[in-house]
């Protein structure tokens, strides 16, 4: 299976670089996986597709202001993007500088704060800060907007590049399907008899890394930390017992649930995952998916293709481009019902 099979043309004008005035103001492209039928809706129309007894699973990770600017004590400017918080004072981070800092180098953070480069782990740098990391990031850090947004972060991004139910700090990218939900919509969903549960997956910067191989099977996924609690396992079991559907809000919720059910049975799990879902891989838990539109040739587009079927997904994306949908993190959304017999690119005769 070739990465190039997942390419599509996207006009630059369709990349959403700012959020809409209202979270729920986005459009919603509904894809019925079994039939391939499309419906063009507003995000608030999602209520029409939910049933009493369904279970919606959200990712409650909280985006940290993970981007720092500063300089080495020796002089050169640099940019730090925290990838993972290791403990109260240490992080793994990407460092951009004209010359990479050496072990023992001191880093002076703009706005106040210092760090020492402790060790290098492949492309990541282990940094130890002179004070607690999370309060420092909240004070002087910048929201880590994705590269394709292509603008400096603004004050409003602290609120809008964050879900309203974000709770557990640790992500350096938002679980963007959740950005469409405001408190009023969540209340309407609950009033309809739809249950909710929360997993945690701390989204890493690796989610934006391009696939650098020609064949999908040769790709190695980045690792991210997740937790699926016993409460979630019990909620899924109760949903199944009453005939409801499990609806994942975002690909991170899909990856969390399917990581915890790799042997076919959902179990409580806490730890790293490198699960790579592409056409041909079965789904054990998720029945429906709320998701944004993803980058060409990305692992997330491959996940959606595995869920809905490759021809159905690519046809939906072509329709979205034609109809002027807004793409990526601050863009519009899809609601997808799983295709029970999805076809891959190799099935296109």
Curated annotation (Swiss-Prot):
Pathway(s) where this gene product acts: tRNA modification; tRNA-queuosine biosynthesis
| One GO cellular component, as annotated | cytoplasm
Gene Ontology terms: biological process: queuosine biosynthetic process; tRNA wobble guanine modification
Pfam families hit by this protein: Queuosine_synth
Q: What is its main location?
A: cytoplasm
Subcellular location(s) of the protein: Cytoplasm
What would be an example GO MF term here? S-adenosylmethionine:tRNA ribosyltransferase-isomerase activity
- Signal peptide coordinates: none
Q: Which Enzyme Commission number(s) are listed? A: 2.4.99.17
Keywords (A to Z) from UniProt: Cytoplasm, Queuosine biosynthesis, S-adenosyl-L-methionine, Transferase
What's the domain of life for this entry? Bacteria
Q: Which reaction does it catalyse?
A: 7-aminomethyl-7-carbaguanosine(34) in tRNA + S-adenosyl-L-methionine = epoxyqueuosine(34) in tRNA + adenine + L-methionine + 2 H(+)
Which InterPro entries does this chain map to? QueA (IPR003699), QueA_dom1 (IPR042118), QueA_dom2 (IPR042119), QueA_sf (IPR036100)
Task: Give the quaternary structure.
Answer: Monomer.
> What family name appears in the similarity comment?
Belongs to the QueA family.
Q: What does this protein do?
A: Transfers and isomerizes the ribose moiety from AdoMet to the 7-aminomethyl group of 7-deazaguanine (preQ1-tRNA) to give epoxyqueuosine (oQ-tRNA).
PANTHER family cross-referenced by the UniProt entry: S-ADENOSYLMETHIONINE:TRNA RIBOSYLTRANSFERASE-ISOMERASE (PTHR30307:SF0)
This protein's name? S-adenosylmethionine:tRNA ribosyltransferase-isomerase
């Amino acid at each position: 299976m070739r990465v190039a099979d997942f390419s599509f043309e996207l006009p630059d004008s369709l990349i959403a670089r700012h959020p809409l005035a209202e979270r729920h103001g986005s459009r919603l492209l509904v894809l019925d996986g079994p039939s391939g039928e499309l419906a063009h809706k507003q995000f608030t129309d999602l209520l029409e597709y939910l049933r009493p007894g369904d279970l919606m699973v959200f990712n409650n990770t909280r985006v940290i202001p993970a981007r720092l600017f500063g300089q080495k004590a020796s002089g050169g400017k640099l940019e730090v993007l925290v990838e993972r918080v290791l403990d109260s004072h240490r992080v793994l981070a990407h460092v951009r500088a004209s010359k990479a800092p050496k072990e023992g180098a001191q880093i002076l953070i703009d706005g106040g704060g210092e760090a020492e480069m402790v060790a290098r782990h492949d492309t990541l740098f282990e940094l130890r800060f002179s004070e607690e990391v999370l309060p420092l990031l909240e004070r002087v850090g910048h929201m880590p907007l994705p590269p394709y947004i292509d603008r400096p972060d603004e004050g409003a991004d602290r609120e809008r590049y964050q879900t309203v139910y974000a709770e557990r700090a640790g992500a350096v990218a938002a679980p963007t399907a959740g950005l469409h939900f405001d408190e009023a919509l969540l209340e309407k969903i609950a009033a309809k008899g739809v249950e909710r549960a929360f997993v945690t997956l701390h989204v890493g910067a690796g989610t934006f890394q391009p696939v650098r191989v020609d064949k999908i099977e040769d790709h190695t996924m980045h690792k991210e930390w997740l937790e699926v609690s016993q409460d979630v396992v019990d909620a899924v079991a109760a949903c199944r017992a009453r005939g409801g559907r499990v609806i994942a809000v975002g690909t991170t919720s899909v990856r969390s649930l399917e990581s915890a059910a790799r042997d076919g049975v959902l179990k409580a799990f806490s730890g790293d995952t490198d699960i790579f879902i592409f056409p041909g891989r079965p789904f054990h838990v998720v029945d429906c998916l709320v998701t944004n539109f993803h980058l060409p040739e990305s692992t997330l587009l491959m996940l959606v293709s595995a869920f809905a079927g490759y021809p159905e997904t690519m046809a939906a994306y072509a329709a979205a481009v034609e109809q002027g949908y807004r793409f990526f993190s601050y863009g519009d959304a899809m609601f997808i019902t799983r295709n029970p017999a999805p076809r891959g690119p190799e099935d296109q005769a």
